[in-house]
Regions:
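A structural signal for multi-pass alpha-helical bundles of membrane permease subunits
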Residues: 2-92, 96-334
């Protein structure tokens, strides 16, 4: 009670956020997990079974006298009641059939492979480019403010708008094919970047890199500015070459920031949705997120729930890894 009297205002202010988290995050996730274990065919089999029992018992009853007919009708009613109780049971239709179906579905296996490929390729490209830009912006340069504004511009553009912009670049009649044609690197037939395979994966990686690069640049700039000037001065006194200084001094001190950036980007990359949906669609280059959406639009709700549950589990692994690293780095300073 003393705690409530002391912090009643803080608790009152937390209630809206707590209600939002429970109502719009926790409950949907738990409902999705529950639905992923329900066999969608159970309800159909139940209806068919009830219908067959009714037909059989009715036909048999007509073959006997009224007294025996009443006995069969009683058995029929008891059977229907037992089936109704079975359907109302919380364990009715519970099985792993949706997960078995997913891991035998070639489209879902391709979706996992495409998601992993986009994540790994995107992380590698974004790490190199973001670090290079951060190193450039951390130095005194003329027009650095303008260049920083240009670099950070994609951060304020909605993802759907970014995807629409990218369609003007990667369309068969887009700017990229036009440039390749002018350079003599492309014949009369334009490249269909959305045809699937590695072309579509590279297209999504490039679009995603352009969209999220500012966030990684900001993280790396913060890490570079956190390095004490005395460290740089000591390496300059030693006469270390710039590359040697980067790999032996700057990069080790940037390790916590790089780790956090990679984990956060991995979480975001696994749940990427709008860019691949608009650029590549769901048929040629399925990802886990777009596969989940596609199955939902086909009214395969339980299969979609199972796919979403798998995606949630993967993301939670990255989240717990992130929290573990944060706590581990905090302990020496405690």
């Amino acid at each position: 009670m003393r705690f409530v009297k002391t912090y009643w205002l803080e608790m009152l202010m937390v209630i809206p956020l707590l209600a939002y988290i429970i109502g719009f995050t926790l409950l949907p996730i738990l409902t999705n997990i529950k639905e992923s274990f329900i066999d969608q065919r159970f309800g159909r089999r139940y209806d068919i079974l009830v219908s067959k029992i009714a037909d059989i018992t009715y036909d048999i009853a007509h073959a006997y006298e009224s007294e025996e007919r009443r006995a069969y009708e009683t058995e029929r009613a008891e059977a229907a009641l037992a089936l109704e109780r079975l359907q109302q049971s919380p364990y009715a239709g519970v099985s792993l059939s949706n997960y078995r179906k997913l891991f035998t579905d070639r489209s879902f296996i391709n979706a996992i492979g495409n998601t992993v490929a986009i994540t790994l390729m995107g992380l590698a490209l974004q790490l190199v480019v973001a670090m290079s830009i951060a190193l450039l912006l951390s130095r005194p340069l003329h027009g650095k403010g303008l260049f920083r504004t240009i670099v950070l511009t994609p951060l304020g553009i909605p993802t759907i708008v970014s995807a629409t912009i990218m369609t003007y670049i990667f369309d068969t009649s887009g700017y990229l094919n036009e440039v390749l044609y002018k350079l003599g690197l492309l014949g009369e037939v334009p490249i269909d970047w959305a045809q699937g395979g590695w072309l579509s994966i590279c297209m999504v990686v490039f679009a995603d890199t352009w969209k999220v690069l500012p966030l990684m640049v900001l993280l790396f700039i913060a890490g570079l500015e956190a390095i004490p000037h005395s460290v740089h001065e000591a390496s300059q006194i030693d006469g270390s070459p710039p590359m040697y200084k980067f790999f032996t001094v700057t990069l080790p001190l940037m390790k916590p920031y790089i780790t956090m950036a990679l984990i956060l980007r991995a979480i975001d990359a696994f749940r990427i949705f709008e860019l691949p949906l608009i650029l590549a669609g769901t048929a040629t280059t399925p990802l886990i997120s777009t596969f989940t959406y596609s199955e939902y639009t086909r009214q395969n709700y339980n299969l979609s729930a199972a796919s979403g549950t798998i995606l949630t589990g993967i993301i939670l692994i990255f989240v717990f890894t992130y929290l573990y690293i944060v706590e581990r780095d905090r302990e020496p300073n405690a």
